[in-house]
């Protein structure tokens, strides 16, 4: 039993290593090179606080009565452009990312499920995770999509995560024999029966 556990852990570590290597190879060419370059400045742990600051700054802007309507509009346009550029960098960072450890996955999940992060941003991040996992299969991102599907209150985010999970599952035929894959597939089948109104 101890030996089987050791072998399982070694295989898991090898999988993580291979995910990083394959993503590094892809990031040396084509569009992934650009995505990695544009997203490399993003710290995953700072994504949620930074997105929340944008919301706070927007609220404060409209509460600032010292500014004229025109000044507020100009400041709002600048803030929106800054916010869009930041979202684009997050997307690039997520798509070109390698293996995420448990802490990073928890931070990403918390960000996507946060009520202070708008639905469109959460959907964008789910799409980025989907593209990353569909390009280089990563069991951690695969299960993260499933967790987001299960836990999201926002139906749009929930459906995006489910579709992402299904897309990734069709791209990872070699993992169909993986015990985790089978258990997730069985659980998802049950969940879809309960959430048939979403489909």
Q: Language-model features: where?
A:
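Long alpha-helical HEAT/HEAT-like repeat alpha-solenoid scaffolds in very large eukaryotic proteins
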Residues: 178-199
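The canonical alpha-helical register within tetratricopeptide repeats
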Residues: 9, 16, 144-151, 184
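Alpha-helical solenoid repeat scaffolds
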Residues: 9-16, 32-37, 123-129, 159-170, ...
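Extended, helix-rich scaffolding/adaptor regions
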Residues: 1-69, 81-85
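Short secondary-structure junctions and interdomain/linker hinges
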Residues: 21, 28, 132, 191-195
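Alpha-helical solenoid scaffolds in large eukaryotic transport, assembly, and signaling factors
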Residues: 46-152, 158, 164, 168-177
């Amino acid at each position: 039993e101890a030996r089987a556990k050791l072998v399982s852990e070694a295989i898991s570590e090898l999988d993580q290593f291979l995910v990083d290597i394959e993503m590094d190879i892809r990031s040396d060419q084509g569009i992934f090179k650009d995505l990695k370059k544009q997203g490399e400045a993003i710290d995953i742990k700072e994504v949620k606080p930074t997105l929340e600051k944008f919301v706070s700054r927007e609220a404060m802007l409209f509460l600032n009565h010292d500014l004229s309507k025109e000044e507020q509009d100009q400041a709002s346009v600048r803030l929106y452009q800054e916010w869009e550029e930041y979202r684009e960098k997050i997307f690039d960072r997520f798509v070109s990312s390698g293996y995420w450890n448990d802490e990073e996955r928890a931070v990403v999940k918390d960000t996507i499920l946060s009520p202070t992060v708008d639905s469109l941003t959460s959907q964008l991040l789910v799409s980025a995770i989907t593209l990353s996992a569909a390009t280089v299969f990563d069991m951690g991102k695969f299960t993260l999509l499933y967790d987001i599907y299960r836990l999201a209150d926002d139906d749009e985010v929930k459906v995006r995560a489910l579709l992402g999970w299904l897309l990734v599952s069709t791209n990872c035929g070699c993992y169909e024999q993986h015990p985790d894959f089978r258990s997730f597939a069985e659980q998802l089948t049950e969940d879809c029966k309960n959430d048939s109104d979403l489909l």
